[in-house]
Amino acid sequence: MDLYKLTVHELQDKLLAGEISSEDIVKSLFSRIALVEEKAQAFITLCEETALEGARRIDQQDEYGGIKGIPYGLKDLFCTRGIKTTCASRMLENFVPSYESTASKLLNEKGGILLGKLNLDEFAMGSSTEQSAFFPSRNPWDWERVPGGSSGGCAAAVAAGEIPFALASDTGGSIRQPASYCGIVGLKPTYGRVSRWGVAAFASSLDQVGILSRDVRDCALILKIIAGKDPLDATSADTEVPNYCAFLDGEVKGMRIAYPREYFQHWVTESIRTAVMKALRKFEELGAIVEEVSLPHSEYALPAYYIVAPAEASTNLARFDGVRYGLRDDEADNVIDMFSLSRAQGFGPEVKRRIMLGTYALSSGYYDAYYLKAMKVRRLIASDFAKVFRDFDLIVSPTTPTTAFKLGEQIDDTLTLYMNDALTVPVNMAGLPGISIPCALDDGLPVGMQLIGRAFDEATLLKAAYAFEQNTDYHRLTPVPGGGINE
């Protein structure tokens, strides 16, 4: 039995029916990892011994349910007690936390089994995993292409069948963009819906914990577990967390769906525009009302983001100085040189670039011209979304302007690389929930459709995504590693 092909809820059913054990699942997945990991390069750290021990312990209890006995992966910026957390950086290459992130702790308490920590762009700053200090991950649909970023290791592992789901973070599209490139589902909840405690911070007003999985039902199931108020995270929201799975079978008939003209411009490839418009017609067939709208300030989201996010990163990363933890240069003659040399050796070029951008934007004489202006743009973007949501239930757009690009193709073209997040960044700037689901293939590569919802209305978002999924077969397409598809 190819257990690696199954979703979380399918594994649940087989565990409850007594057809398989948790140990069977874990062994099957590690066999799969042994087969494809040399190409995928998705994992930074594997936890085979502890995963097998955990599975056997759960099997002895002979009591399954929820995610009990089901394996998962973590983007390697979630702190894991006793397990290395590197952020894909030389700065934290040997850092072993003494505490567990809230989100992973909630999964562990429900019986989830951690298989390993997954690759990312260093400190989540990138769109391809090529900024990892260790190695780039690869796209299972074509090993010569990127899986996206910064959560590319998570997306590659899920798409390749190495894990059924993963937790990751999304600051400007870091869950949705790789989900689109790898043909899986990627959910970024509303800002504050899930605790960020124990997750290494990039941009604190934009970061959000989310999920990568093979289908929408799995996202709904996992979100119910990890969502909610956390006393350790002041930015987590004290709002009701519904049973998201209960909403999935609702009708979309009469639902009002908007598509913004600004998200279908010439810099989005024609094949992707065509694919998403075809997907919108599927919603119309299901009884939804689809209309064009305008989000006029979204075109300014990317430049504003690259002021706000680096500004916050420059303050968040100031803590890495070689004193309490992280890489330390022992050759320095004084403490100032030690700070400077430790950071020079510990941080990669993209992280340094963003620290310098952020420090400049916050510096005396430039704060008003850059940071303050960017925050004003951010408010205008949020206002545009609010106006549309007065009359519509959902907004639909492409997730990315192109399909996955080749490794090395954009590494020296920073502006083009940043443009990969042009359609996802506005959602983070407004703090809204967004999900990417597969909606087509373009020359054998997955195309993602992005659904955007009202704040804290993930239920409607998931219902619409599930309706599309149940009336199409794109989520059932899986890659034959290296090229081609299994239908």
Swiss-Prot record:
It is an enzyme of class 6 (ligase). Pfam families: Amidase. GO terms for biological process: translation. The active site is at K75 (charge relay system), S150 (charge relay system), S174 (acyl-ester intermediate). One of its GO terms (molecular function) is glutaminyl-tRNA synthase (glutamine-hydrolyzing) activity. GO terms for cellular component: glutamyl-tRNA(Gln) amidotransferase complex. The keyword Ligase applies. It catalyses: L-glutamyl-tRNA(Gln) + L-glutamine + ATP + H2O = L-glutaminyl-tRNA(Gln) + L-glutamate + ADP + phosphate + H(+). Its EC number is 6.3.5.7. Keywords: ATP-binding, Ligase, Nucleotide-binding, Protein biosynthesis. It comes from the Bacteria. Heterotrimer of A, B and C subunits. Belongs to the amidase family. GatA subfamily. Allows the formation of correctly charged Gln-tRNA(Gln) through the transamidation of misacylated Glu-tRNA(Gln) in organisms which lack glutaminyl-tRNA synthetase. The reaction takes place in the presence of glutamine and ATP through an activated gamma-phospho-Glu-tRNA(Gln). This is Glutamyl-tRNA(Gln) amidotransferase subunit A. It comes from Syntrophomonas wolfei subsp. wolfei (strain DSM 2245B / Goettingen). The lineage of its organism: Bacteria, Bacillati, Bacillota, Clostridia, Eubacteriales. The gene is gatA.
